[in-house]
Amino acid sequence: MSCRSEHIWIEPIKGARKTSNFCWAIILFLGSLGFLLVGTSSYLGRNLISLFPSQEIVFFPQGIVMSFYGIAGLFISSYLWCTISWNVGSGYDRFDIKDGIVCIFRWGFPGKNRRVFLRFLIKDIQSVRIEVKEGIYARRVLYMDIRGQGAIPLTRTDENFTPREMEQKAAELAYFLRVPIEVF
C-alpha cells in the first residue's frame, strides 16, 4: 500500500505487528504457562491443571525442568509482546524526486536510538540491487547501493516475495529513481 505521486513515493514498512508474530506470542505464552503450572502443581502436590494427576510428575527432576521451561518461555513470550507493542522494524521509505532526497525511517527498541532515520541524496544512489539466494530457505532482498555507504536493505529478509513481485518492485523503483538494476 504505497503512496505515489509524480515527484514523491512513500513506501510504508510493516514491522513486528504481523499475524505470525501474534500467533507465536500467544502459542508461546499459553504453552509456557502450562509448563509452569504443571511444575508448580508437582511442587505443591495439588492439581492446578485437571488434565492429569500431579502425582504422576515428580518434582525432582521433571517438575523443576518443566518450571524452568515455563519461566524461560514466559520471558521469550514477553519479549515478543514487547516487540509487537513497540512495533519494532516499522517505518517508511520516502523518495522525493523534486527535492532530490531519500529518507528511510524505522522504529527500533526503546532507548537512545529508538528512531533510525537515514537521509541521503538521490544523486548518490548508484543502483537498485536484487540479491537472490536459492535453496531450502530461499530469500530475495531488495537493496539500494549508496555511494560511500554501501548497500541499504529496503525489504525484510522474512518477506516472501515471488520473483515476479520482487522484479516488479525493483523495476518500478529503478525507473522512478532513474538508476540501473543489478541482480546478484
Swiss-Prot record:
GO terms for biological process: photosynthesis. It is found in: Plastid, Chloroplast thylakoid membrane. InterPro entries: PSI_Ycf4_assembly (IPR003359). The keyword Thylakoid applies. Keywords: Chloroplast, Membrane, Photosynthesis, Plastid, Thylakoid, Transmembrane, Transmembrane helix. Its main location: plastid. Belongs to the Ycf4 family. This is Photosystem I assembly protein Ycf4. It comes from Helianthus annuus (Common sunflower). The gene is ycf4.
